[in-house]
Every structure is written in structure tokens, then in C-alpha cells.
Amino acid sequence: MKYHISLIFLFCSTLLFAQLEISGLHLHRLSEVQNAKRINQSTDTLAIPFFDDFSQYTGNPDTLRWESGSGAFVSIGLGIFPPSKGVLSFDGLNEFGNPYDFRSNFPKGTADVLNSAPIDLSPWAPNEDISLSFFWQQTGLGEAPDQRQGDSLIVEFKIADTDSTFKWEVVWAVEASDSLPNDTLLFAQINLEDVAYFYNSFQFRIRNRGTLSGNYDNWIIDY
């Protein structure tokens, strides 16, 4: 049985369809083709499917699926021919629309950091073909990331470091390319093949590295 997390999302690849379920993350079973719902557990985790195509709302990401305070923003009109009408954007502005750093001259560093809500993957295993997938676009109708400055878009998974602590592991990253047209839409799929990911409060996060002093170095994500 195959499952797929489509951006930013988890879903069953036997019924693979084009929806960003990590920007969706989309993971579903034949009997679960529905919106993700919270499970009443002590950790208050989400069940799969986990799906978000960013077409039903604008502004801050939905706190049912995403942790608050990320700085990432859902908008209509910033992507160029995206799969759905809404897209998730990353730049150098925080959740209040202010620069992360307005004191320095063109400061660089980690800007928006979007964490998924905890997802219960304990019922599944690496041999069940679970994956996270999404479409991404460099720039769109925003300001272009800078190849020379090492601007990048990064996906990380949360894994146990010790019995009581966790760490974030980079599982996918792309650096800005000056030769990539701003309307190019690319697809990413990250297979969950490590047993360390299959626990009851799995999380993934998406972050960007770029200029921290304004609405610069835009990256677009959709399902």
C-alpha cells in the first residue's frame, strides 16, 4: 500500500492526484479521501490525509495544519500559472509584514520557517511508500532570489536525537539559480524511507534563506 505526502502533504500514491497536500502535504487511504482532522490524543496530532492547496484562504497558514508564527504567507496572484489559485510564499518579512532585520544593510539568513502540525505516522512503515510532495517556483511575480548570495529553499524532517530531544534533518534543498525563469514550475517528491520518521508526532518544516530586510528573494510553493 502506497501513501504520499504532497506538500507538504501525505497521500496514498495508489490514488495519486495532483494536489499539494505539504504546501501541501497530502496522505490518504482509500477510505480517507477527506480533509485531515485532529485526533484526540495527548499530543493532539493530525491523521493522514494531510492536505492543503492554499486555495481556500489567504493570509497566515491555517493553524489546523501549520504552527503559527512562521512568516510564510498564503496569497492569490503571486505565483505564475500555479496548480491552484492560492500559493504559499516565502520571503524576508515576518508574520506581521515587517522585515526580520531592518538595521543591517542587506542582512542574510534564515527567514520564514513554516512547521507542520504534528502528524501521527506511527501506524505506517517505510515499506508503505509514504512521501512528501509539492510544486515549487523560484520568484513567481515576486523578487528573485540571488544565486551569488546562496539564497535557498529547504525542507527538513524532525527526528529523535536522544530519548528526550529532537533535531531537524535536511532532506531536500534547492539553491537559487539566475538562469531559472521565474515562471518555471517544478515538482519535488521526498520519500520517507527512514524508520525514524514513523512516530506519533512527526513534523516537517519548510524554510527559506535570503535577505532579511524586506519582501525579497521570493519562493512559491503549491500542492
Question: Where does each model-flagged region fall?
Answer:
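Extracellular carbohydrate-recognition regions
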Residues: L20-S84
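Extracellular carbohydrate recognition and processing domains
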Residues: T162-Y197
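Extracellular ligand-binding interfaces
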Residues: D129, Q138-V174
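Extracellular beta-strand-rich recognition modules
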Residues: F54, N115-P145, N200-G210
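Surface-exposed, low-complexity/disordered Ser/Thr/Gly/Pro/Asn-rich loops and linkers
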Residues: G71-D129, G142, I220
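Bacterial Sec-dependent N-terminal signal peptides
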Residues: M1-L25, S213
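Extracellular carbohydrate recognition
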Residues: P107-V113, A144-R148, Y199, G210-Y223
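Extracellular beta-strand ligand-recognition surfaces/modules
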Residues: L25-H26, F134, F187-G214
